[in-house]
Amino acid sequence: MMFIEMNQLQMAFGRQVVLDDVNLDIPKGELFGLLGPSGSGKTTLVKIMIGMLKPDYGMVTIGGVQMPSLRQMKKIGYMAQSDALYSELTGRANLDFFAQLFQIPKARRKERIQETAAIVDLTAHLDKPIESYSGGMKRRMSLAISLLHEPELLILDEPTVGIDPLLRESIWADLKKIQAHGTTIVITTHVMEEAAKCDRLALLRDGVLIAEGSPEQLEQQSGTASLEAAFLHFSKPSSQTEGSVS
């Protein structure tokens, strides 16, 4: 059994179909990427995964439990595209606030705040107000918050949007450290360089899963030398039924 199973997911908003019969399996411990342009259905898919949206048809199971499940949702860390931080509070106060929301025991809370701040390299900035943080620091603080309750599954929606290349590399280094501890990570991105760092990818276009496999497999099957070229290849109508790589 796969850790995450998505079966025949369909979703529409009015007449606009945003997901069209999406089927995906993700094993435990994998860093899995959802790659596609804006409007391809990536955010809708992750919101269905975490129980924020209910699909019109199909289902998602995580750890063998059908979503939405409150028990499973407590095991998920989610980082949205926009930062939900209290700018007038310090980084430490933000972490403490969310630690209480996650019901982390008081005896463990202080230690966990230090641990997550260290993972994202913000220890030296914990007592500064969030309003003084750079954009990259705010993204890293959001990542720290999503890690507070030690989730089994981390879902990140465009975590490096609007961030300069140097800080993007720093966040990816953080993600690799988190994965090394056994956490399953699902990340959405439209940046090819980031997608290449994932273990496997699902390519989405207009709500349709057009290809799936490792970056190397996708390039090999498409006969191209880059992920961008592979994505363009699989976007052709004649290729969309041939894009699954095991």
Predicted features along the sequence, with ranges:
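Catalytic Walker B motif of ABC-type/P-loop ATPase nucleotide-binding domains
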Residues: 154-158
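Conserved ABC ATPase "signature" region
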Residues: 96, 100, 107-125
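Helix-to-loop junction immediately C-terminal to a conserved catalytic motif
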Residues: 50
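ABC ATPase "signature
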Residues: 212-213
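Conserved ABC transporter NBD signature motif
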Residues: 58-74
